[in-house]
Amino acid sequence: MTENYIPRLKTRYQDEIRTKLQGEFEFENVMQIPGVTKIVVNMGVGDAARDSKLINGAIEDLTAITGQKPQLRRAKKSIANFKLREGMPIGAKVTLRGDRMWEFLDRLLTVALPRIRDFRGLSDQQFDGHGNYTFGLTEQTMFYEIDVDKIDRPRGMDITVVTTAVTDDEGRSLLRELGFPFKGEDGNRQQ
């Protein structure tokens, strides 16, 4: 990225969203205004215990989606029922921060989520009590970076958005302002 480029969503957060949140929650200090710290994208590949080539597909997909090489996750303990031994690769994860994080969030909200068939919005009940939000996607084909003809199998992923919000209400308000399409009480998307 060039030196003077600032991601679109980051600019919107700094110019509009911070002021709205300050007015909504009446923070005394600007450092109390919630922001996004990092995004963790995790892809678990449990079948990699039987076929080690499957983990390579997950790594390639995550690299294409996030633009960053994923970290290989290995099993911490052996579990005989799953035919799993300690140290076997069972997943991959990427931690995005800074401009890459803002770009990924922008692509996720404007391109990927609207491409999901029969998408009615994300549940707003998946906060962890400290303003962090985790949701899962069932397949990786909704991202334009993935060539549908070249994928060997559909893989789901978990995406965690870590914020500096203290409560779930602050985190929910921040993500709603950023453009997260949360479901309403009736199960349909809120406007």
Swiss-Prot record:
GO cellular component, one term: ribosome
The entry's keywords: Ribonucleoprotein, Ribosomal protein, RNA-binding, rRNA-binding, tRNA-binding
GO molecular function: rRNA binding; structural constituent of ribosome; tRNA binding
UniProt-listed Pfam families: Ribosomal_L5, Ribosomal_L5_C
Record InterPro entries: Ribosomal_uL5, Ribosomal_uL5_bac-type, Ribosomal_uL5_C, Ribosomal_uL5_dom_sf, Ribosomal_uL5_N
Gene3D superfamilies: 3.30.1440.10
Presence of keyword Ribonucleoprotein: yes
Record note on quaternary structure: Part of the 50S ribosomal subunit; part of the 5S rRNA/L5/L18/L25 subcomplex. Contacts the 5S rRNA and the P site tRNA. Forms a bridge to the 30S subunit in the 70S ribosome.
Role, per record: This is one of the proteins that bind and probably mediate the attachment of the 5S RNA into the large ribosomal subunit, where it forms part of the central protuberance. In the 70S ribosome it contacts protein S13 of the 30S subunit (bridge B1b), connecting the 2 subunits; this bridge is implicated in subunit movement. Contacts the P site tRNA; the 5S rRNA and some of its associated proteins might help stabilize positioning of ribosome-bound tRNAs.
PANTHER family in alphabetical order: 60S RIBOSOMAL PROTEIN L11-RELATED
Family classification: Belongs to the universal ribosomal protein uL5 family.
Protein name: Large ribosomal subunit protein uL5
Lineage: Bacteria, Bacillati, Actinomycetota, Actinomycetes, Mycobacteriales
Name of the coding gene: rplE
